[in-house]
UniProtKB/Swiss-Prot annotation:
Cofactor: Mg(2+)
Gene that produces this protein: miaA
Organism: Thermobifida fusca (strain YX)
EC category: transferase
Higher taxonomy: Bacteria, Bacillati, Actinomycetota, Actinomycetes, Streptosporangiales
Alphabetized UniProt keyword annotations: ATP-binding, Magnesium, Nucleotide-binding, Transferase, tRNA processing
Protein name: tRNA dimethylallyltransferase
């Protein structure tokens, strides 16, 4: 079975740039590569600035898949993403191309790469929990989750009502902890996972600079436009980092500067959770984000831990 490459790690560490550079390097070696998005918020149409979605120019001619597939009013569903991602992976393999999965949404990465089956839903249980979320707020439900499944609570942001509700729903339906539905790391495809890491002070600074750039690039105006398209009604998209804070500003619940400062704080907290998630996966090969030979080292990992480079060399000898 053909290999998948994944580039993972916390936000603002440089995953997208590395994925493009690595795809180009693979293509140069006769291994045409294409990129599959594994950032849950980049799946949404129009959420460009706040998700740091690469522009067409920044993609440097490398085909990208699973960007802009959902409207902002649609609730994210990891099982739907799993079906889409696996279909793209299988299509690329059939075409003789190398899939490069990139993103920091840990559950989405695992859904694409691993043997994971997601429990079904119970509309009555879901409706009751969503009503409790609306009445009590996410912090109260997160405290309940912490009592029932401490490991799941550590992995889910206390403000992420959607994921808290889903975890509580699974616990109620299955009678077991939510984390029991995430078994040991069993790969569906041969995979080389490359993780980018940065010292915390440097990553914190990169996050602050990124938020500054997003504001300068017009994030507030982007949110205003998406609000007209139904962003407030989107159960998932309205809670995205930056978007949730600006929606509060537009509603008069805080100042713009407070929204910006909270975006920085919330993003830093999220980055810590992302790194903790990926650190638990022993298959990830970690590289420093600022290594001067980063692309060379990433390509070397691909050659060392897969047969891709051997296949490329064999084709060269036969041609």
């Amino acid at each position: 079975m053909s290999t998948v490459i994944a580039v993972v790690g916390p936000t603002a560490v440089g995953k997208s740039d590395l994925s493009v550079a690595l795809a180009l390097r693979l293509t140069e070696h006769g291994l045409p590569a294409e990129i599959i998005n594994a950032d849950s918020m980049q799946l949404y149409q129009g959420m460009d600035i706040g998700t740091a979605k690469l522009t067409p120019e920044e993609r440097r001619g490398v085909p990208h898949h699973l960007l802009d597939v959902w409207e902002v009013t649609q609730t994210a569903n990891v099982a739907d993403y799993q079906r889409m991602a696996r279909a793209v992976i299988d299509d690329l393999h059939a075409a003789g191309r190398v899939p490069v999965l990139v993103g920091g949404s840990g559950l989405y990465v695992r859904a694409a790469l691993d043997e994971l089956d997601f429990p079904g839903t119970d509309p009555k249980v879901r409706a009751r929990l969503e009503a409790e979320l609306a009445e009590q707020g996410p912090l109260a439900l997160h405290a309940r989750l912490a009592r029932l499944d401490p490991e799941a609570a550590r992995a889910i942001l206390p403000t992420n009502g959607r994921r808290i509700v889903r975890a509580l729903e699974v616990i109620e339906i299955t009678g077991g902890p939510f984390t029991a539905t995430l078994p040991d790391h069993v790969s569906r495809y041969p995979c080389v996972q490359i993780g980018l890491t940065a010292p915390r002070p440097e990553l914190d600074e990169r996050i602050a600079l990124r938020v500054d750039r997003m504001w300068e690039a017009g994030l507030v105006d982007e949110v205003r436009a998406l609000e007209k398209a139904g962003l407030r009604d989107g159960f998932t998209a309205s809670r995205a980092l930056g978007y949730a804070q600006i929606l509060r500003f537009l509603a008069g619940e805080c100042t713009e500067e407070e929204a910006k400062e909270e975006t920085v704080r919330a993003t830093r907290r999220f980055a810590r959770r992302q790194e903790s998630w990926f650190r638990r996966d022993p298959r990830v090969h970690w590289l420093p984000y600022d290594a001067p030979d980063l692309v060379d080292r990433a390509f070397a990992l691909v050659c060392e831990h897969s047969d891709l480079c051997f296949r490329s060399a064999t084709r060269d000898e036969q041609s």
